[in-house]
Amino acid sequence: MLNTYNDKYLLYPVLYFYGFGNGILFKALLQNKNHQHIVVFEKDIEIIWIMFHILDFSNELQSARLMILENDKLQAQDYTELCSSKPFFQFSRIYFLELMSHYYERFHEDILGLNKKLAENFKNIILRNGNDPKDALQGIEQFVYNLPQMITHPSY
């Protein structure tokens, strides 16, 4: 499983997971300096409590490289703060919510709801901040470049 993440998401600065599992994967992923933050949403807080007695995550938690959120306790404001802060907002285009293990598939309703809330919040934050002026200038440049072709070769 670690090889999959190292192949696909080696340079991703933010990773999102549903479920904490045994925590060993997170310990390994946090060895990669490119991963600035790993956000874990967990429904069963007892799993985290048990794993904290086995593995030490104190440095990762203090530096906020590992963020564990109990998704049943999150309010709308929590989602907004997470999605609008750096680097989460900056890398919102590469957002995905990954399951920690097959065990968490039985929580598919919660996962879909969480994914929907996060996607909606990212969308709202993006719309609130507006488009990047570089995108608008690129669109104008492409329009002007293609204008002679559109005038001389109409599609109808």
Where are these regions (language model features)?
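N-terminal donor/sugar-recognition subdomains of glycan-related enzymes
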Residues: 1-156
